[in-house]
Amino acid sequence: KKYKKISPISLQIKSPKETGKTFIENSRLKVKFFSKYVDFPVISDDSGLCIEALNNKPGIYSARLAKKHGSFFKAMKFILKKMKNKKNRNATFICSLSLNNRKGKVTCVEGKLKGKIATKIKGVKGFGYDPIFIPFKKKITFGQMPKLKKIKMDHRYIAFQKLKKKIKI
């Protein structure tokens, strides 16, 4: 099936404040909010990077950390500075998806990809924290990986596969 992707920006809808304490809470909050404006199914996501040695931060504040520092590049430098003497470099990319089917049912799933934080920024591909995240069993960051290879293994792909299975597409 073909689906048309419509973003809140194209509908001139501002995103709601993310007041949830988890990725799923924020994803659910957004899907309920955006569903008020349209009469078709809506999928919303909330994603981020959780670093064990930093008490799972930036977590739900991943995008806000980049905004606070002025860019993802500066946020990555900030993270690498905090990680400088840390032995535990384990991290997890998380994507929570919520689907409102327009019949009053909201379905939520979460995709997780474990990896580790690189010692320096490597690569220019992808976006966000991709240049410092090395998936387990890989030797390069997402920022160094070809786009198609990254897309077929990342946390969003995992979440969409779970959603697809749950709603039986």
Question: Where are the model-predicted features located?
Answer:
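Anionic-ligand binding patches
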Residues: 1-169
